[in-house]
Amino acid sequence: MPKKLPIFYNALLLTGVNLVLRFVSTGFQVYLSGKIGAAGIGLLQLVLSVGGLALTAGMAGIRTSAMYLTAEELGKKRPENVRWVLSGCIKYSLVCSGAIAVLLCVFSSSIAGYWIGEIGVAGVVRLFAFFLPVNCLTGVMVGYFTAANRIGTLAAVEVAEQVCTMGLTISLLHFWAGDDAVRACAGVVMGSGLGACFTLLSLLYLKKKENTTPGSRIPVTKRLLNTAVPLALADDLKSGISTVENLMVPKRLALCGKIADPLAAFGMVCGMVFPVLMFPVAILFALAELLIPEFARCAAAGSHKRIRYLAKRSLRLAMLYGGLFCGLLFLLSDGLCIWLYDNREAGKYLRWFALLAPMLYCDIITDAMIKGLGQQTACVRYNIITSGLDVLFLFLLLPTYGMEGYFFSFLVTHLLNFILSVRRLLKLTGKLLSPAVPLLTGLAIGVAIFLSGMLTALVARGVAYILLLGSLLCLFQVISREDVRWIKGLIRKK
């Protein structure tokens, strides 16, 4: 293995960067909600859903593929082959993203009118198509720098990109868009696209400065397609179903007599609740980003013991971390949503989804480990099953049960996906955690929430929950002396 910073310190570095970026992103979401309202946020979410589908289709699995194939070459001590891997990835990306961009431009009016329901955003769809190849090529370069363990460089560029993007976007919103929701959508897409241009040029310049001597040309196409196509199918299916859901939800909610403003209710959950729910995930996204190439390198080098060790530690960390924020978000939900959005109803929805935090956070890590071990085809199967169920549940439940039906569908499908993913991981690594560990963790979370909820002051609730949860986890021996020694060792290690 290369003698570079351990994965723990790289994860800390990415965590710091991701936290800063998430603070900025959440603040921007608050700014937008105050400027264009819940209905405007709902329209923006629909536009971004279509854009997200196009981006996923244009990426066609290339970001993870570039990361995986680069890590594989480095794990086999063949750095001279990386140039040919990148060359193949770039050509693949240009073909896929170019094709999707053309389709977006040709069908922009139909997408805006029939899918989104607002013909005025057709220009926004075309604007997104213009920047699509840039975003996809940026994904290739980010995958390379992550696999090459150049985390510091990547973090610096990402911070600079975010500063550039936010500055441009806020300027466009303030001086041009005003409170016009369609112009606000265009401003967000324009700012993001120009930020992607900055990132791509920066990473290409830094790669060129490496002056690595390439080896003899190697065949890449078959390996690339074997990796990228299953990923593309899984990602496209997941994104496609997600887009269908987002476009369908307001229309099906309109049939429910309990929902006065379906677009506002949809915007409240997707544009207000989910950003808060997923804000603490910065550390796990950082870890997941590093686990894919790390597992690929270990698998290529035959380091099965290290794979098992990392899988056990990562899954345990995600479970405990999710448990911590499960209770905090549940107990502080009303205060957070009133402070951020001046919206008490969003607090009710945040309480519902906060209870799912341990499962959602663990699923992020599990998915990364499976991809790092080359199990892309399994991901396709799981996404087909759960996504199909999600659409069926939403179609049937929303007109009768409203947002309660939305939550039920979210719970069942995400739980099923998580169970299938964990089952696949355990087949590859063997037993990682005793079944008693998640059960005792859940018991500790429930008791800590119940006792802390008796307090009225929000700060007191939060502090009491942290202390109670930590004490109960130690009492139940979920956190052992071995864990404490491990943490101390990480802190002391140079």
Please describe what each predicted stretch is.
Residues M1-V24, E80, W84-S87, I218-K238, ...:
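N-terminal membrane topogenesis motif
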Residues S93, S97-G240:
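Hydrophobic transmembrane helix module of multi-pass membrane transport proteins
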Residues P6-M67, L94, A101, C105, ...:
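Signature of the first transmembrane helix
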Residues S109-F128, L329-L360:
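Interfacial segments at transmembrane-helix termini and the short loops linking adjacent helices
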Residues L21, Q29, A60-M67, L127-T146, ...:
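Short runs within selected transmembrane alpha-helices of multi-pass transporters and secretion channels
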Residues S452-K494:
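Membrane-proximal transmembrane or re-entrant/amphipathic helices at the cytosolic face
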Residues A60-G75, M278-S303, A311, L315:
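Helix-loop junctions and terminal segments of transmembrane helices
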Residues L32-L53, A181, C185-A186, K222-T227, ...:
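Interfacial/gating helices of multi-pass transporter permease domains
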